[in-house]
């Protein structure tokens, strides 16, 4: 066993109190500096590794993607890059325009290309929609994905925050009460993340159909389906043409494990797509993202993806079971995604304590959710990784004191 492997083995057995207090303090100070620069988002694992070399970061649980899907895309991209003429052409030439890429997606999902806008990741799409088409009053359920309130144009739009109901084991949306609130407060725009981030709660398909019908008076229903591939139901794109006010947002980062190439799309009305294309979004995708979108119509690639997804889904199910009773000081809420919202039950501890313990003592990076609207310093989020990593995560959580 190498010295590095021995260090990793020892790291799996430690408490923060076992480490040099000055070293722990130094690491915490460095982390706070880089966190400050990242705003409401956690610093990426690569940044943590670069800026805090004292940390031996082995497992990134802030990362919310399917690790097996990443391998499938990487394999094909490596093969493509070996063709030097192809690679040179991709680098030298302008990429395909937005409308051309939309045709790849249209063919793959059975929606007209005129209703598809390609984004440089879902976050760009969220920003574009909020700033160009959302005016008046917007309702955002909490907890939520922070760009939905960060990118609202505060000069033209007023945000109404509405908490999800929390019971013993889950968060959920009470549609009846939500409807009354919207009618009383003249809400004309609403955000729905399904399954929700960061807690993984789900509005089932029949309830979602009922929701769309009852909220058809809205100017805009922004439905974020970033995690829908992990849920026990299909996308609402099958009923898209039944409603004039719905926009469905899809990130490719989470389900295909390709955050680095920035690929996402939305399904929306032709007017919105035309407006975006006429106002600066012709070439907003890079060559690798375009290569990926082309693979959505590659039967072999999609077959391999399905196998990777099925494998990952089994590991998510097993991981959730192991989380349930791993530590009496920790509580995890029911999820229909690959993410799990946890709560610290010890009154003397908070999620930041757990985050530092996992990072410094075990090299496992989790998300402290104390800065998320609708949550407090007791909450954290953790994602499912590969089975061998999940075992290490569970063991570290069991040892937490």
Q: What are the residue ranges of the model-derived segments?
A:
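Active-site phosphate-binding strand-loop segment of PLP-dependent enzymes
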Residues: 169-231
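N-terminal "arm"/small-domain region of PLP-dependent enzymes with the aminotransferase-like
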Residues: 2-93, 107, 173, 185-186
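Conserved PLP-binding active-site segment of the aspartate aminotransferase-like
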Residues: 62, 268, 341-348, 361-399
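PLP-dependent aminotransferase-like
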Residues: 17, 27, 124, 131-192
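Short loop-beta-helix segment that forms the pyridoxal 5′-phosphate
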Residues: 94-95, 106-128
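PLP-dependent aminotransferase class I/II
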Residues: 97, 245-325, 331-333
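Conserved PLP-binding catalytic core of the aspartate aminotransferase-like
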Residues: 313, 326-361, 384
